[in-house]
Amino acid sequence: MSETRKCQVLVVGAGPGGYVAAIRAGQLGLDTVIVEGDKAGGTCLIRGCIPSKAMIHASERFEHLAHHKDGHMGISISGDVALDMPALVSWKDDIVERLNKGVEHLLKIAGAELIKGDFTTEETFVELMEC
């Protein structure tokens, strides 16, 4: 299904560059549309930097707990330190979802319309008009 929508600012892609541009354009009162084929936040937020750093952070915490088994720093842990991988993945997914919803909310309150889908055009040019 194709849809025609006129606007003053069209942003293709809701990654870190796209959503920041759309938020600012919306804050300036421009009729802004941002088109994203996946989730708002882009690769960095959805499957790159943020999820990777969450998993690295959790693994570092796990390693630090393991050091306390022998009373390191006067802290003792009784029993084995265990990792529940499904729970860890769920925790990471919750972080990603929360940040994704945060980006969508920022777009909404700025007045930028997020359209989930792919942007296509048969035109080979973009017409620029003075605002």
Residue ranges of each PLM-predicted region?
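Short glycine/serine/threonine-rich phosphate/pyrophosphate-binding segments
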Residues: G17-A21
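Glycine-rich flavin
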Residues: E3-C7, I23-L30, V35-C131
